[in-house]
């Protein structure tokens, strides 16, 4: 059907433009005399297909306008929703809660959005006078109404009055603290109307938005992990995201500026970000933590739930979510609120929703987003850093963990390969997420930046997997001092540097949550359990790693941080062994490590014969060990072999 194709076209056009759609807000429709196609709940405008539209019987919908409902607002909304669902022909698709508003306008195509610029006007003190000044009687302005049935009836009555006065319906309806409806015969007309409305408002803005990023203070690593624990004391870990910009910095610089964004401007902002937010003005670590703990406890006590938005002077915007996806939505919506507040200054100042209006939205079940709270992954919402995760064992471990609900930081020097791996991980993720962080694990400053990136992306650190390592085979005659020192630096020294940095975050978290545990897991080797001929430099670095593991475990146990090593057998399919130029099969052949071996296949057969199970070790095997070590709370300082029986502990 041509009209539905056009509806999809215009839906995607605006849905993919963040100036018009934030967090999936807004909806579109097409109607003929008998039926209405309207965006179904749970479908994004940006990617919508024909299956994303609910189809309704307009005759049955019209009953809603004349039927008498309960005077109790909750009961009334439930009754009206029931009638709306009864009109739905496509029973598997729930129509938008605003479907009745689309039906109230007679134009075939309707596009309802919440554009930032328009809501700067709609959420201003002088909204009615300024709307009249800018548009005259070209548009229909409707003062705020609670969403749902009440809004539908108010708009219907306003349309009827407009028709009585003007002799025709309005093409544009502007809703206070809500957004805009545009109706027309064609999608081209709708596009032209939107362009005209936005251009008119844009020319009335007296000061442009502050542009550009702003630095996030290094204090973030000493503050935000503790705040994460303050909002995670119910046994379910939260994800936090930290962002800063010139715009955020302006609103965070004082209580006066924060007050301009201290309440929601629309139902959506109240739904996604809650109706109240926290501002912290302290400027030292101890003072910030003290103020945060006090205000978060007060917030929970008075509201019955955790805050989703915390603005910290000198640090930036901290968003709280049940997973990384929700955190990103909270960030998008609150940043949009900041822009709305800024634009509103051109129209007399900001006008947030009243306490009574917020209360209705807080209790409005019909439109509350059904976020996935907790998945069934074994490490759901835990935060991992995996070094050397761009490829090989690290990549395999990261892929296993992302399937189990983990948030992953791919820490590696290889930016190109790391970016590819991170993209693959995110395609596998659901509510969780992966990011790439370029890191040189032998450089303390690079590790410090890695920790900061992790805290900003996810709010803290639960598990550090020290996986990055190198192997250079050689006997006493052929091993160079340069190769020996390089292996020691990467396989041994870096483990110390990473543990030092990671344990600081874990100590801080556990100080604020008595039930929390942290894990540091070194991916060692079977060569860390027994000597390796013509491979002493590698084996020595791995033996030393187990010594560090045991010593770190003794030191960190009082802080509820477990430290363990995993000693995998040979990962024959990975680049460490199978690289045709520098792989260990080639190195061992050239070093004469396997007596009588004349080819790479001879070397491989020799190593397979060393394992009773005649198999190499795969990342999935190692990941099972990682999960075991995390889930248990009775072992630390251990070296767990995963070798198919090749190495057996005494």
Language-model features and meaning:
Residues 1-384, 396:
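Glycine-rich flexible loops
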Residues 475-476, 480-485, 607:
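Substrate-binding pocket helix/loop in short-chain dehydrogenase/reductase
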Residues 479, 531-539, 551:
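Active-site loop-to-helix junction immediately N-terminal to the catalytic Tyr of the SDR YXXXK motif
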Residues 499, 541, 549:
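Active-site helix of classical SDR
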Residues 504, 554-555:
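Alpha-helical segment proximal to the catalytic Tyr-Lys
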Residues 525:
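Residue(s) in the substrate-gating loop at a strand-loop-helix junction
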Residues 615-642:
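C-terminal substrate-recognition "lid" of short-chain dehydrogenase/reductases
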């Amino acid at each position: 059907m041509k009209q539905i194709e056009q509806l999809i076209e215009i839906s995607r056009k605006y849905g993919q433009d963040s100036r018009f759609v934030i967090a999936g807000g807004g909806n579109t429709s097409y109607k003929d005399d008998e039926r209405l196609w309207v965006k179904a709940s749970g479908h994004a405008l940006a990617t919508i297909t024909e299956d994303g539209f609910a189809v309704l019987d307009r005759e049955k919908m019209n009953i809603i306008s004349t039927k008498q409902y309960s005077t109790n607002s909750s009961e009334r909304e439930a009754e009206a929703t029931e009638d709306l669902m009864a009109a739905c022909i496509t029973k598997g698709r729930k129509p938008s809660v605003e479907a009745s508003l689309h039906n109230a306008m007679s134009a075939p195509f309707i596009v309802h959005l919440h554009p930032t610029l328009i809501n700067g006007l709609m959420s201003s003190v002088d909204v009615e006078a300024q709307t009249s000044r800018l548009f005259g009687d070209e548009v229909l302005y409707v003062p705020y109404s609670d969403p749902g049935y009440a809004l539908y009836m108010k708009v219907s009555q306003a349309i009827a009055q407009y028709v009585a006065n003007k002799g025709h319906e309005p093409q544009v309806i502007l809703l206070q603290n809500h957004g805009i409806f545009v109706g027309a015969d064609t999608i081209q007309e709708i596009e032209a109307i939107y362009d005209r409305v936005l251009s008119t408002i844009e020319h009335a803005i007296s000061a442009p938005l502050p542009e550009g990023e702003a630095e996030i203070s290094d204090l973030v690593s000493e503050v935000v992990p503790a705040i994460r624990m303050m909002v995670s004391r119910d046994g379910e870990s939260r994800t936090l995201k930290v962002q800063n910009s010139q715009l955020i910095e302006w609103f965070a610089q004082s209580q006066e500026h924060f007050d301009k964004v201290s309440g929601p401007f629309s139902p959506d902002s109240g739904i996604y970000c809650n109706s109240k937010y926290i501002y912290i003005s302290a400027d030292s670590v101890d003072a910030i933590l003290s103020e945060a703990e006090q205000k978060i406890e007060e917030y929970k006590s008075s509201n019955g739930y955790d805050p989703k938005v915390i603005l910290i002077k000198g640090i930036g915007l901290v968003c709280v979510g049940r997973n990384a996806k929700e955190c990103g939505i909270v960030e998008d919506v609150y940043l949009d609120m900041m822009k709305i507040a800024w634009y509103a200054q051109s129209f007399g100042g900001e006008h947030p929703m009243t306490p009574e209006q917020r209360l209705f939205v807080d209790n409005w079940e019909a439109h509350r987003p059904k976020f996935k709270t907790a998945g069934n992954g074994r490490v759901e919402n835990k935060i991992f850093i995996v070094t050397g995760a761009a490829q090989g064992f690290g990549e395999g471990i990261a892929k296993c963990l992302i399937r189990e609900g983990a948030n992953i930081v791919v820490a590696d020097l290889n930016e190109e390969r790391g970016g590819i791996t991170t993209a693959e991980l995110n395609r596998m993720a659901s509510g969780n997420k992966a990011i790439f962080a370029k890191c040189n694990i032998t450089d303390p400053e690079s590790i410090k930046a890695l920790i900061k990136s992790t805290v900003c992306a996810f709010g803290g650190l639960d598990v550090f997997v020290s996986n990055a390592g190198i192997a250079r085979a050689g006997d006493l005659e052929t091993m160079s001092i340069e190769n020996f020192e390089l292996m020691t630096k990467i396989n041994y020294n870096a483990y110390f540097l990473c543990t030092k940095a990671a344990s600081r975050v874990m100590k801080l978290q556990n100080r604020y949550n008595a039930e929390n545990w942290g894990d540091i897991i070194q991916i060692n080797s079977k060569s860390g359990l027994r000597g390796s001929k013509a491979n002493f430099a590698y084996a020595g670095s791995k033996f030393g790693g187990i010594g560090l593991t045991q010593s770190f475990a003794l030191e960190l146990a009082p802080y509820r941080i477990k430290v363990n090593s995993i000693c995998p057998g040979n990962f024959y399919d990975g680049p460490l062994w199978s690289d045709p130029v520098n792989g260990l099969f080639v190195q061992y052949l050239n070093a004469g490590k396997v007596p009588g071996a004349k080819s790479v296949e001879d070397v491989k057969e020799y190593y397979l014969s060393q394992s009773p199970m005649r198999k190499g070790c795969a990342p999935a095997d190692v990941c099972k060990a990682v999960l075991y070590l995390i889930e248990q709370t009775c072992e630390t300082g251990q070296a767990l072999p995963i070798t198919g029986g090749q190495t057996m502990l005494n």
